[in-house]
A protein has these predicted regions:
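Short, well-ordered beta-strand segments in beta-rich or mixed alpha/beta enzyme
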Residues: 2-9, 39-66
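Residues within well-formed alpha-helices
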Residues: 5, 24, 51-53, 73, ...
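Non-catalytic surface loops within mature trypsin-like serine protease
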Residues: 10-12, 58, 92-95
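Short amphipathic alpha-helical segments
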Residues: 14-37, 70-75
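Residue-level signal for secondary-structure boundary sites
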Residues: 16, 60-62, 96
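Short conserved AdoMet
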Residues: 30-33, 57, 83
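Glycine-rich beta-strand-turn "strand-cap" elements at beta-sheet edges
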Residues: 39-46, 76-99
């Protein structure tokens, strides 16, 4: 399982535009083949900073999504709203602690 976190900083006047894009695409992304989890996080101290947190079956599943029309159109509409360059992190669970 691959865990993907993308940190995005938006122009403050474009946050509502981003939220509309996300709300219109979130179910399509979540149900894209290979995606098992999706959530949107908002920074506590900077409300114009968001992170998507998603789980993908494999690196290839994520790459297939990144090459899809869904990603291309969603990303094209989103990236014009940025105030700063986004940061993306791909990880795997290294140690998991259960109670």
């Amino acid at each position: 399982m691959l865990i993907r976190i993308v940190r995005m900083t938006f122009r403050e006047d474009k946050v509502d535009d981003f939220l509309e894009i996300f709300n219109n695409s979130k179910n399509k992304i979540r149900h894209f083949e290979g995606c098992h989890f999706l959530e949107l996080l908002r920074d506590l101290d900077a409300p114009h900073v968001f992170m998507t947190h998603s789980h993908w079956e494999t690196e290839q599943a994520l790459e297939t999504y990144r090459q899809s029309e869904l990603f291309k159109t969603t990303w094209a509409a989103t990236k014009v709203l940025f105030a700063d360059k986004p940061m993306a992190f791909s990880s795997r669970v290294f140690v998991k602690i259960n109670e």
